[in-house]
UniProtKB/Swiss-Prot annotation:
Transmembrane segments: none annotated. It is found in: Virion. Its main location: virion. Host antibody response against A104R protein is higher in asymptomatic than in chronically infected hosts. Stilbene derivatives SD1 and SD4 disrupt the binding between pA104R and DNA and inhibit the viral replication in primary alveolar macrophages. This is Viral histone-like protein. Keywords: DNA replication, DNA-binding, Late protein, Virion. The keyword Glycosyltransferase does not apply. Belongs to the bacterial histone-like protein family. Gene3D superfamilies: IHF-like DNA-binding proteins. InterPro entries: Hist_DNA-bd, Histone-like_DNA-bd_CS, IHF-like_DNA-bd_dom_sf. The record marks 57, 69, 72, 74, 83, 85, 92, 94, 96-97 as: DNA-binding.
């Protein structure tokens, strides 16, 4: 019972679509996307929030430390020890209202 894979726009397809829509060449589009990625990475390293219009929000969140705990192997029911996880940072990506409105 395998789920059908949703169609995905690849990076190269995205570059081609943007190039066709803006009438700019693909090399320039690729440089723009690469620059955008670097800017987002730099902002997140400095704990800055980034919003990409029309409404995708990137934030850095701190995930609390989790202590070691007892669990069980779901296949065998055998008890296992789950390791503790230290506090760490993660990126949270959220679609804002304008993006949700696009779907309705």
């Amino acid at each position: 019972m395998s789920a059908k894979k949703k169609p995905t726009i690849t990076k190269q397809e995205l570059y081609s679509l943007v190039a066709a829509d803006t009438q700019l060449n693909k090399a320039l589009i690729e440089r723009i996307f690469t620059s955008q990625q670097k800017i987002i990475q730099n902002a997140l390293k400095h704990n800055q929030e980034v919003i990409i219009p029309p409404g995708i929000k990137f934030t850095v969140v701190t995930v609390k430390a989790k202590p070691a705990r007892q669990g069980h192997n779901p296949a065998t029911g055998e008890p296992i020890q789950i390791k503790a996880k230290p506090e760490h940072k993660a990126v949270k990506i959220r679609a804002l209202k304008p993006v949700h409105d696009m779907l309705n």
